A protein has these predicted regions:
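Transmembrane beta-barrel domains of outer membrane proteins
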Residues: 2-6, 51-53, 65, 226-228, ...
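C-terminal beta-signal and adjacent terminal beta-strands/loops
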Residues: 71, 243-254, 258, 273-327
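Outer-membrane beta-barrel strand-turn architecture
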Residues: 7-9, 22, 54-60, 229-233, ...
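Transmembrane beta-strands of outer-membrane beta-barrel proteins
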Residues: 12-16, 62-64, 221-223, 237-241, ...
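Flexible, surface-exposed loop regions and adjacent strand-edge segments
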Residues: 30-37, 78-89, 93-94, 255-260, ...
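Hydrophobic, lipid-facing positions within transmembrane beta-strands of outer-membrane proteins
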Residues: 1, 46-50, 219-223, 266-270, ...
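Gram-negative outer-membrane beta-barrel transporters
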Residues: 20, 39-253
């Protein structure tokens, strides 16, 4: 719903509108297992826009536009965050499988701790070394493995492809007495049933209710000023400056700070335009006058890339000259 108005004997136009959209199964893409997968959410988008132009004297013109947009995911929206598969739950840890596997998995912290304890006990004194995840979530060098040991790199495959407890290499058994090596379990290990893992070990759903849609800054502003005047009987010139500003937004639907946050930025442009009655036009311009570098969007890649992120930025400062002829 909107309104369009002409004011001040035609010297000013003032337009405005309000809007409300309700989406079902709004699609947002992310990379999973090297494939683009659509996540579907219900969402609402509402806001208001205003634009105005004013020419107080012949040749001098001002323009302004502003927008407010409120975007929200519906209650009950949820998804697995690939860079935070445990959703901050300390009882679970992210494990990277073999390099040939495309996706990480999650395993209970108790399973990881018991595997590390069993490996150390079974391989005490062995000279062969490798590296595995430590209980603190990083890498620990110097863990000693025998040739038939089960490294943590296999734990995801064992749990979610074979359906066995990685500690025992057998189907779930409550309070198992021994580990894979036949050594007694002394740490009070209760056993792990892979069937009970959240979402088959892919991760824990995050509650996204009320989160903003990606690349939807709540506030945007633009303004410009130009002055046109005759230079001779054949030529006219126009000088113009315009700017654009947008507030903070998010690159992903998870709205994780600071990773997902896209900071607001300002962009200013200048131009000089010369035209004549024969259809020639010459324009000299500067885009992004202050050489502002801002990230305007980001795209998260899959686990096997190390969860690398592609970012999109504003163009650098650009000087240009354009000559055109119209017939």
């Amino acid at each position: 719903m909107g309104t369009k108005n002409t004011l001040l004997d035609g010297a000013m136009t003032l337009n405005g509108d309000v809007f409300y959209y309700k989406y079902q199964n709004y699609q947002i893409s992310q990379i999973v297992d090297r494939t683009s997968v659509n996540l579907n959410f219900n969402a609402t988008v509402k806001g208001a826009e205003m634009e105005a132009t004013w020419e107080p004297v012949p040749g001098l013109r001002f323009n302004f536009a502003g927008g407010y947009e409120n975007t929200r995911l519906a209650n009950g929206s949820q998804a697995i965050d690939l860079i935070d598969r445990t959703a901050g739950n300390p009882n679970w840890m992210v494990v990277r499988p073999f390099i040939t596997e495309t996706s990480n998995c999650i395993l209970p912290t108790a399973v990881i701790n018991q595997l590390l304890s069993s490996f150390r006990a079974a391989n005490h004194g062995n000279n062969s070394t490798s590296a595995a995840y430590s209980s603190s979530g990083g890498f620990e060098d110097g863990l000693e493995f025998q040739g038939d040991a089960i490294p943590l790199l296999q734990a995801c495959y064992q749990a979610y492809s074979q359906g066995v407890d990685p500690v025992t290499n057998h189907t779930y058994m409550a309070n198992p007495g021994t580990d894979y090596f036949g050594n007694p379990l002394t740490d009070g290990y209760a056993g792990f049933n892979p069937a009970t893992a959240p979402n088959s070990g892919e991760g824990i759903m995050k509650n996204l209710s009320g989160n903003q849609l990606p690349n939807a800054p709540p506030f945007t502003l633009s303004a410009g000023t130009q002055y046109s005047m005759p230079l001779s009987t054949d030529w006219a010139g126009t000088a113009r400056v315009d700017g654009y500003w947008q507030g903070n937004s998010f690159a992903r639907v998870f709205n994780d700070k600071p990773y997902d946050q896209l900071h607001g930025y300002t962009n200013v442009n200048l131009s000089l335009i010369f035209t004549n009655q024969d259809g020639w036009q010459a324009m000299a311009y500067v885009k992004n006058m202050f050489d502002t570098t801002a990230i305007t969007g980001a795209f998260l890649n899959s686990d096997d890339t190390g969860l690398s992120t592609n970012v999109f930025t504003t163009d650098p400062r650009l000087f240009g000259l354009r000559i055109t002829k119209n017939w």
